Amino acid sequence: MKKIISEIKPFARAVEQSLTRRRRFKEKLVHRFAQAVADYSLIEPNEKIAVCISGGKDSMLMAKLFQELKRRNKIPFELAFLVMDPGYNVDNRKQIETNADLLDVPITIFESDIFNSVVNVEKSPCYLCARMRRGHLYKKAQELGCNKIALGHHYDDVIETTLMSMLWGGQIQTMMPKLHSTNFDGMELIRPMYYIREEDIIAWRDAHNLKFLRCACRFTERLEGEGDAESASKRKETKRLIQQLKKSNPAVEANIFNSMHNVALDAVIAYKTKGQKHHFLDSYKEELMLPNDPMILLSYINTKLRDNYKTLDALCDDLQADKKEIEQKLSAIDYIYDAKLNRFI
């Protein structure tokens, strides 16, 4: 153990110690990272995970948290730290390499030409870029013997995505903590930063005076040059909306996050699962079907009359049921409706 510690660079060692010794970082970074891994079963024993590093604060912190989790050795797993260069300029590439060296993260860099592919796309270039990046990362991760890729999306990303899906997409969906790849057999995507707040990531970054990339793509650079980057991002607009709502309701962020853990399917008009759409009317009539067995029907009707309805007519109207049919079925077992008692006897 001493030999390992002596090989760690002094600055990296200080960063690692801050994660376990500073209360805020230990509770809000290390513990929440481990909690998400446990709650969503993100890591299984003996897996190899490709930690995908973009050069931003989120993914770099994720790399350090994975190293800390591995040091605990509660779950045996392997790590590869993967950086894709989609066409960074020299300065941005250098900054990623410098930060990785400074933080003692042994990165593997590979090149792609994604920026050139999307820079002239007018509609949704960011979405296309993200999709293409993910495909390249899956492919390289497989080549390295990994079965999962880990992305650095955090709690704030989750709630913003949830709200964006409603406001801009006309649907209800969220950013999932893990997903099966649809194009790479046996591969999964995990998001272990799921419980971590962006403000705590920023606090960690600033505590160590670290400088990370933001979005280094040419599309963003062009928009910033035109002064239009703010209006180009629906995510930024959604972020501002959440902050505005938070002024009158401090729990709004937690409520958005928790809403995706408390979906009442009985109270939605329609939903999709596995590519198939289900409408509440599909089962609406089935839910109102009365039991066929006369004795079960008797118990069901008498219970309803006792607890909720003053007359048989009211019950039948509410259930859209045929009163005569019910009376015939129950008369077959020698039960008739007594209006005074409001029950079948």
Q: Where in the sequence are the language-model features?
A:
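ATP-dependent adenylation/nucleotidyltransferase module used to activate substrates
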Residues: 2-164, 168-172, 176-180, 199-203, ...
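Catalytic subdomain that performs nucleotidyl-dependent activation
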Residues: 79, 157-237, 241
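Short, basic, helix/turn surface patches
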Residues: 132-144, 178-184, 238-259
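Short alpha-helical "recognition helix" segments of helix-turn-helix
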Residues: 315-316
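The feature marks non-catalytic terminal segments
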Residues: 210-284
